[in-house]
A protein has these predicted regions:
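Small/aliphatic-rich secondary-structure junction motif
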Residues: 1-57, 156-219, 241, 266
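Structural beta-alpha unit
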Residues: 1-2, 41, 78-112, 213-244, ...
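Active-site phosphate/pyrophosphate- and oxyanion-stabilizing loops and adjacent acidic/basic residues
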Residues: 24, 77, 132, 175, ...
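Solvent-exposed polar/charged
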Residues: 25-28, 81, 105-106, 136, ...
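A short acidic, glycine-rich active-site loop
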Residues: 55-71
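Helix-enriched interaction subdomains in cytosolic or periplasmic regions
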Residues: 112-139
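Short beta-strand elements of ligand-binding domains
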Residues: 113-116, 141-147, 247, 271-276
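Charged helix-capping and loop-helix junction motifs
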Residues: 127-130, 201-205, 255-262
Length: 278
């Protein structure tokens, strides 16, 4: 059984607990190496020496930062009491999103899982806006969720994409989920044009995409809507999906990126965002 290496950024809130409960759900079907990461949000001038002591240029009180570090270390230790010694815990210093991205990339994780309070969560350390930044910048797929999904059955996974140029994408995580849960994949493209006029062409492109990416159990969908975000919401109202996967190009102005970020804050579904090749 292949092991999924998962990182859960935590601010010790209930949203971080939701993230862990989601990971537990995945753990029922596949081996998982679980890592919790807490970022002590301090300027770049505050560092740890080789002995783990706080070093600073002086604009921040060393005693204050040391106290915050001690509190965080106790909370991380308590996670092991709550969840078991099989989990790994890490404490790093820096700006929250930058530190999460750097730690994730340097340690080669398969997936980031983040609980978020959505658009109204601006007072939370791990707010919807920070989850959006991770989705935009991370080379590692991000699974975000806004509520407890410990009862989730993964039978239907939605992949939202523009299939006009079928290509082999980096869908390693999705392949692992397919292998573990054997779900039906639903390939969805949203168009502002005529569904009847485009359907045959788009379905042929979807079939080619599925073949290129080793997806065998799938269904094709083309719907008309004013944008991707509304299309995904309306599709979920018609056919209930368990997980929504949507790609982002990571560049400003492309609709997939803005749709991903809006859905993270407004769709009460686990969302996996990942970077596309094109």
């Amino acid at each position: 059984m292949e092991t999924l290496k998962i990182i859960i950024p935590t601010d010790f809130s209930v949203q971080a607990e939701f993230a862990y409960l989601m990971v537990q759900r995945l753990e029922e079907k596949t081996a998982i190496d679980i890592h919790f990461l807490h970022v002590l949000n301090v300027p770049d001038t505050v560092t740890l020496d080789s002995a783990g002591n706080i070093q600073t240029c002086g604009e921040i009180d060393v005693n204050y930062v040391t106290k915050q570090k001690d509190i965080a270390e106790r909370k991380l230790a308590n996670l092991k009491v709550l969840y078991g010694d099989h989990i790994n815990t890490h404490l790093v210093l820096g700006k929250t999103t930058d530190a999460i991205l750097k730690f994730t990339e340097s340690n080669h994780f398969d997936l980031i899982v983040m609980g978020t309070k959505g658009a109204s969560g601006l007072k939370e350390k791990l707010s919807g806006s920070e989850t959006q930044i991770i989705a935009r910048k991370s080379k590692t797929p991000l699974l975000s969720l806004m509520c407890d999904r410990s009862d989730l059955q993964i039978r239907n996974i939605l992949l939202v994409h523009n299939f006009s140029q079928p290509a082999k994408e980096n869908l390693v995580l999705m392949q692992k989920l397919i292998k573990a849960f054997d779900p039906k994949m639903h390939l969805l493209q949203i168009t502002s044009g005529s569904v009847d006029a485009e359907k045959a062409k788009v379905e042929a492109q979807m079939i080619q995409f599925a073949e290129l990416n080793g997806i065998s159990n799938f269904q094709c969908h083309l719907i008309n809507d004013k944008d991707v975000e509304n299309g995904v919401v309306h599709f979920n109202q018609m056919i209930n999906m368990d997980i929504v996967c949507i790609g982002t190009h990571g560049k400003g102005g492309l609709f997939h990126q803005s749709a991903t970020e809006k859905l993270i804050n407004h769709l009460f579904k686990p969302i996996i965002s990942f970077h596309l090749n094109n």
